[in-house]
Amino acid sequence: GGLLMWYKVNRLIAAIRGVPAGVSLPSPPTHQTKYSIEEAVAKMTQSMYMAWGFRVPVYPKISATSTAMAVLNNLTRNPYAAGLAIDGEDGGTGAAYNVSMNHMGHPIASNIRDGYLNLVKLGMQNQVPIFAGGGIGKNGNLAANTAALIMLGASGVQVGKYIMQAAAGCLGSENDRCNICNIGLCPKGITSQDPRLYRRLDAEKVAQRVVDLYLSFDTELKKIVAPLGRSTSLPIGMSDALGIDDPNIAKRLKIKYVV
């Protein structure tokens, strides 16, 4: 979920959502009868599973915070939950205020590591997959970031902003981004509801670029994990293959400190 800024709530969106135009919309809406993590997680997973007729796996997605482990612990006892997706502090979205995007959340690496080690203690590391997101590949090193997170315990990664930049031509960057995706004026038409803007986006070309990007990413990832003897399976939790030259980070993530 997030916040659909009032700039984007035009007549069409307002009609679909049944609200006045020009009003910011929290998404999803709050459940006033749920006052604990346990109740919220149970409601979320059960409702989604019921909506899909119990045929599609459901992966709740949460922000990387101090409560992420509490959510994960509840998922280990929830028969409806198939896994957990965690979005770190570097994640970018067009559905939030800048203060939310730039100054909230925990680093994804520490949350993923804590979650995996917690699952190991419970003997459930192969039963409840964790997916990492948030700024992965933001410096053009998607495969390397992915490999590191997998070795820390992630079962996979989710990528959004990097795909928009590499495949859809997003003009934003970490150092000089345009900062207007959240107000509906994206010059590439990616995050705009204005027909004069979104018609600039060639969806077919972007779709092909996405395919090409993931095929290239798959090749690069195999180049990294193959020397570890994992050419056909992911080295989930193989932290002995990781090292870092910062003793504090090494201690926090429980990986090797190398000079």
Model features per residue range: what roles?
Residues 1-23:
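ATP-dependent carboxylate/acyl-activation modules
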Residues 26-201, 205:
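Glycine-rich phosphate/ribose-binding loops and adjacent secondary-structure elements
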Residues 18, 105-106, 123, 153, ...:
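Glycine-centered secondary-structure boundary/capping sites
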Residues 201-259:
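C-terminal extensions of enzymes
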Residues 11-14, 23, 122, 179, ...:
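Flexible, active-site-adjacent loop/turn segments at secondary-structure boundaries
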Residues 13-17, 25-31, 258:
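Glycine-rich phosphate/pyrophosphate-binding loop
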